[in-house]
A protein has these predicted regions:
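Feature captures the FAD/FMN-dependent oxidoreductase FAD-binding
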Residues: 12-99, 210, 217-229, 242-245
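C-terminal, flexible cofactor-proximal segment of oxidoreductases
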Residues: 212, 253, 268-385
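Glycine-rich active-site loop/strand segments that organize a redox cofactor
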Residues: 1-31, 111, 119, 123-129, ...
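Short glycine-/acidic-enriched loop or helix-start segments at secondary-structure transitions
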Residues: 101-103, 152-153, 180, 257-259, ...
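Glycine-rich dinucleotide-binding loop and its adjacent helix/turn
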Residues: 24, 31, 92-162, 168, ...
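A Rossmann-like FAD-binding core segment of flavoenzymes
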Residues: 42, 49, 53, 157-268, ...
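Mid-domain beta-loop-alpha active-site segment that forms a flexible
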Residues: 30-32, 145-155, 194-198, 320-327, ...
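Cofactor-binding loop segments of dinucleotide-utilizing enzymes, especially the Rossmann-like FAD-
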Residues: 145, 171-173, 310
């Protein structure tokens, strides 16, 4: 980040305002786009390029002798052409956003999900911009209980103010809505806490119909292209009908297809980098606090190959951009020979979120939390997990 800042200053490009919290599009327009256009970077950036596979030159995964001395080969499709690049090291920062989880509650497609895919958006659509016509005056079901779902609902609520025929429906698996609201004003990340407060206010107005806990198993479409979602709620069959569009925010997972010839490891449940699993497991850490980590924790069986960023967290939902920046800094420092710098993890994350002992087994929380046991005696403990 320091080098990027120095280069922007060198080329007299205005820096983003440090005290503002940018939206995703603003990160691109104010920071990534100007940075990528600089002569120091532009020749080395390949857009519209898909990595097909990564491996060692002339060796498959089985071969060991001399493996660490042989360069990596990256096979890339760029438009209609195919290219190969040899490299000393590979950092996989491809994320998980393009590999969303399905709507089915068991981690697999709901019956009929593929047939209804033209009416399902995976991710957060630009509700008030380019996707406006898709949702204005329609009944939209948002599936998911995390911050992405909350963002989508809040955008739809703004659209509802402009067109009262816009209807909002929310389906999630959480036992209580308070779990979705999170820490609110007690969250050490104020902007995230505000999301919880805003969605609670929206629910209390009655302008969004909530179905929870709902475990979806199938989606049906009638002759008028209206969707019905079927599942189980409170041990009984439950159906939501009259749906025009579905926004699916059920999380995402890593895709390892391009790594078939790389010796890589992942946690069996989270699909995260193994050394991170205990730090980020949502079964243990309900509030998402993760201690700082760097190159050492991110090492893979394949020397000089690393998975960083959201993909390093696998299916865990608690990744923060600041974590990824520090991961990248530490790994690059190590690869360039600055071992001392790579070991000095500079990031200090705030104690994020709120641990509710009512939602976590008390003994388990005590055994795994990083706070002392006296803190756990209260019903709610700020930032203890």
């Amino acid at each position: 980040m320091t080098i990027a800042k120095e280069l922007l200053i060198k080329h007299e490009i205005p820096l983003p305002i440090e005290d503002e919290l940018p939206l995703g599009g603003e990160i691109v327009s104010q920071y990534l786009a100007p940075l990528s256009s600089l002569p120091e970077f532009k020749p080395h950036i390949h857009l519209n390029s898909k990595v097909i596979s990564i491996g060692r030159k002339g060796l498959d995964k089985v071969k060991t002798f001399g493996r660490e001395d042989i360069p990596f080969v990256i096979h890339v499709q760029e438009g209609n052409a195919f290219h190969m690049y040899e490299t000393k090291a590979v950092i996989d920062a491809t994320g998980t956003w393009q590999n969303p989880n399905p709507i089915g509650s068991g981690g697999i497609d709901a019956e009929g999900e593929q047939e209804a895919k033209n009416q399902i958006y995976y991710g957060i659509p630009d509700v008030l911009g380019k996707n406006r016509k898709r949702y204005e005056g329609k009944t939209t079901l948002v599936v998911g209980g995390g911050h992405s779902a909350i963002n989508a609902l809040l955008e739809l609520a703004e659209l509802q103010k402009q067109n009262e025929n816009t209807k909002l429906v929310w389906a999630l698996r959480k036992n209580t809505l308070s779990e979705a609201y999170g820490g609110k004003e007690n969250d050490a990340l104020p902007a995230r806490g505000k999301l919880g407060s805003r969605i609670q206010e929206l629910v209390q107005t009655g302008k969004v119909i909530v179905h929870t806990p709902l475990y979806i198993h199938s989606i049906q479409r009638d002759s008028n292209h209206k969707l019905s979602v079927l599942g189980v709620k409170d041990d009984e069959n439950h159906m939501i009908s009259g749906i025009d569009e579905i926004i699916s925010n059920t999380g995402s997972r890593p895709n390892f297809n391009m790594l078939k010839e790389i010796r890589h490891a992942s946690d069996p449940s989270l699909e995260s980098v193994p050394e991170l699993a205990e730090l980020i497991d949502p079964n243990i850490h309900s509030c998402g606090t993760v201690r700082p980590h760097g190159e050492k924790e991110l090492r893979q069986p394949e020397k000089n190959f690393y998975i960083i960023g959201a993909k390093s967290y696998g299916r865990a939902p608690t990744f923060l951009l600041a974590t990824g920046y520090e991961q990248a800094r530490s790994v690059v420092a190590y690869l360039t020979g600055d071992i001392e710098s790579s070991e000095q993890v500079q990031l200090r994350l705030p104690e994020t979120g709120v641990c509710s002992i009512s939602n976590v087994n008390k003994k388990e929380a005590t055994d795994n939390a990083s706070c002392d046991s006296e803190q756990l005696e209260g019903k709610t403990t700020v930032g203890c997990c």
